[in-house]
């Protein structure tokens, strides 16, 4: 009886911890000798990331916005997606994202998309306003007449929490500027 009570309490505790971690907004901010980045994990597929890169070679003034998608689908022609513009919806608005990389990963593939290259300050302000308006940042890979999303992606939608966007971008920006100061 005592053992089952212990396990019951343990599983309730573990469940509560799991729920709190599920709702956590996990940012990673790092740099190497050439760039810095801020990256947040997805809410639907945790391994999918939304990332913002700043390069020392651009004086840390431009930001490259990317997102990655893991797919279990393994069509033989998945590499033909490289450099193609794929239709997406960002909070319901139809856009395209450019495929930058396709790599085998675990039991499928990880596909890296670019949303573009933007001035850091203006784009950060735009994203904050955009996120505050909708309280959502959701990307869905969609079909068009030349592209069937389900052929390549088993999970076509993900979203990211961006409540800590500004502080995370500022931290990555500071790291990038430290790289500039350490120029030889």
Spans of features found by a protein language model:
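A generic "folded-domain core" signal
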Residues: 23-184
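Classical Sec-dependent N-terminal signal peptides that target proteins to the secretory pathway
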Residues: 1-25
């Amino acid at each position: 009886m005592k053992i089952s009570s212990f396990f019951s309490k343990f599983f309730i505790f573990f469940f509560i911890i799991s729920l709190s971690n599920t709702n956590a907004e996990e940012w990673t901010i790092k740099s190497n000798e050439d760039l810095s980045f801020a990256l947040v994990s997805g809410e639907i597929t945790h391994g999918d990331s939304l990332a913002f890169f700043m390069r020392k070679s651009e004086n840390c003034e431009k930001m490259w916005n990317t997102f990655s998608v893991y797919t279990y689908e393994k069509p033989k022609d998945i590499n033909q997606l490289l450099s193609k513009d794929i239709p997406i919806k960002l909070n319901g608005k139809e856009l395209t994202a450019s495929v930058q990389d396709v790599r085998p990963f675990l039991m499928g593939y990880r596909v890296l998309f670019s949303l573009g290259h933007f001035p850091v300050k203006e784009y950060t302000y735009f994203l904050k306003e955009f996120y505050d308006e909708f309280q959502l940042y959701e990307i869905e890979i969609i079909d068009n007449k030349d592209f069937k999303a389900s052929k390549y992606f088993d999970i076509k939608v993900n979203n990211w929490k961006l409540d800590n966007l500004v502080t995370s971008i500022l931290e990555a920006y500071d790291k990038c500027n430290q790289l500039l100061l350490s120029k030889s």
